[in-house]
Amino acid sequence: AQGDKEKARAILAQYSENSASKKADREIVAGVVSSYVHSNGTIGVLLELGCETDFVAKNEEFVALAKDLAMHVCAMSPTSINNEDGLGEETALLKQAFIKSPDMTVEQRLAGAIQKFGENTKVTRFTRYSIA
């Protein structure tokens, strides 16, 4: 990158994506279920974040990521994980800008987690409840 911060970020992002794609076929057998209820009590989310081992599933940063993703689902109202419903990328969780870091998508945030934890990490399902 020769001192160019933007070039370095691009290189790291590419490395992170490559690392994630290499681990994508690994089996998910552990994880956590996280919940988030909005302060007004009318919107709630249950989200399952999967990984390969209990060791990672019990990691504080992994649990915090699951909570952040549940909060994201509450705020952004995705209808699918990766556009399985065909309603478009704007309603696909993985394609949305991550609310805690709008400069990256949820998919990019998960790729960073895969690189950090060294394990396949996926949102396996979520449900958003709303009283309205």
In which residue ranges do the predicted regions lie?
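N-terminal assembly/interaction segments in proteins that build large macromolecular machines
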Residues: A1-A132
